[in-house]
């Protein structure tokens, strides 16, 4: 970039590439791959001399100062001062270009006219509405008529640890703002008195693919990442992983395969809530709203739900506007919803859209670019353009 293309802007490293790796692969820590034998300061020095200006995820000045001293010893103080000033110019240039030094103070009146500006808020909210996908609408239950009485079960969230190692206690609470729901519908805690049930769940969460207990029991530590709630055994996984094991934290492990291992989603209670709600509602309709961060295997509950909505990080009001008909769904699936975990395991990493997509009880295929509006399956210029599938792997 610096020599061939003449780039003189800021180059920032990926996060934590100068830090040491965690003790186990599931620990979100350093990624000093290829330079594990160097000290932290030596890694900084190598990055600086390669032409980078900024260290992603590193707030410690000590290793940078040590790297400077290394450079002085090898190249002299004048050369290292010039190298540091070169990065300083690149970094400060961006600050000067937006006037932060010349005009560091905000005009409060001007800010209030910009921040929270109605037209900006409307644009953001409209974007949320346009991202919500209606997957199933049996008998055209949706939109719900005004005055309907809804039952919304509480959602159980088990104690869990996220990717960064942060822990959260278990909780049982309503998954949406009930005061907001009451502005749209009548609400009851008794399913027998409800016209319809509205169940809010999150997509299956089976963890990050590594389990210390598996390692302690003699395994390699790697377990499946499942897209279904119920227990899944990886019978169709590779016997030998593409990745070459853990050369740093565990050199004895040369295979990350999880073939034959079983995992269950931490939030399997979401599936139980759907099924229990259907049993409580008997013949009355159940609407499932899934907040997704990955595709999901909906075969476990699809037949028990009259309606299924998929969302990707929207506020409660947007979902309620769709359910109530204040807004019509127009979004298309940005992913395939797999028929089962077998097709997930067998898909090719370099070929998009090569999974077997789920077909629901209404005959609709939850493929890439599928979605419903109030009239039925959406067929427009978007579906004409995006429902094309590549046939072969990339070379």
Q: Where are the regions that the model predicts?
A:
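Active-site or pore-adjacent capping/gating segments
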Residues: 4-128, 346
């Amino acid at each position: 970039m610096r020599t061939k293309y003449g780039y003189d802007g800021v180059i920032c490293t990926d996060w934590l590439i100068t830090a040491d790796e965690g003790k186990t692969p599931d620990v979100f820590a350093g990624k000093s791959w290829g330079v594990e034998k160097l000290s932290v300061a030596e890694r900084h020095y190598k990055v600086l001399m390669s032409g980078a200006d900024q260290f992603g995820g590193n707030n410690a000045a000590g290793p940078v100062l040590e790297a400077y001293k290394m450079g002085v010893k090898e190249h002299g103080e004048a050369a290292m001062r010039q190298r540091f000033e070169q990065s300083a110019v690149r970094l400060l240039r961006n600050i000067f270009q937006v006037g932060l030094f010349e005009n560091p103070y905000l005009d409060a009146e001007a800010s209030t006219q910009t921040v929270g500006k109605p037209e900006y808020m409307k644009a953001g909210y409209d974007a949320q509405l346009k991202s919500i996908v209606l997957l199933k609408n049996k008998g055209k239950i949706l939109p719900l008529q005004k005055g309907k009485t809804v039952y919304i079960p509480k959602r159980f969230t088990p104690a869990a640890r996220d990717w960064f190692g942060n822990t959260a206690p278990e909780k049982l609470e309503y998954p949406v703002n009930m005061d907001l729901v009451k502005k749209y519908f009548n609400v009851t805690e008794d399913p027998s008195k409800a016209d319809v049930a509205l169940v809010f769940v999150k997509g299956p969460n089976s963890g990050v693919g590594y389990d210390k207990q598996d390692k302690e029991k003699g395994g390699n530590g790697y377990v499946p990442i499942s897209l279904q709630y119920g227990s899944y055994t990886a019978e169709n996984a590779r016997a030998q992983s593409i990745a070459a094991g853990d050369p740093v934290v565990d050199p004895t492990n040369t295979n990350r395969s999880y073939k034959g291992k079983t995992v269950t989603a931490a939030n399997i209670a979401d599936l139980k809530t759907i099924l229990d709600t259907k049993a409580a509602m008997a013949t009355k309709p159940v609407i499932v709203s899934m907040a997704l961060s990955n595709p999901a295997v909906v075969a476990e509950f699809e037949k028990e739900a009259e309606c299924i909505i998929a969302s990707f990080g929207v506020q409660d009001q947007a979902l309620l506007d769709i359910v109530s008909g204040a807004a019509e769904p127009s979004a298309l699936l940005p992913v395939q919803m797999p028929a089962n975990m077998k097709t997930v395991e067998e898909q090719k990493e370099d070929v998009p859209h090569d999974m077997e997509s789920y077909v629901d009880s209404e005959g609709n295929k939850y493929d890439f670019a599928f979605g419903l509006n109030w009239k039925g399956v959406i067929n427009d210029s978007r579906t004409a353009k995006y429902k094309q599938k590549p046939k072969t792997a990339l070379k």
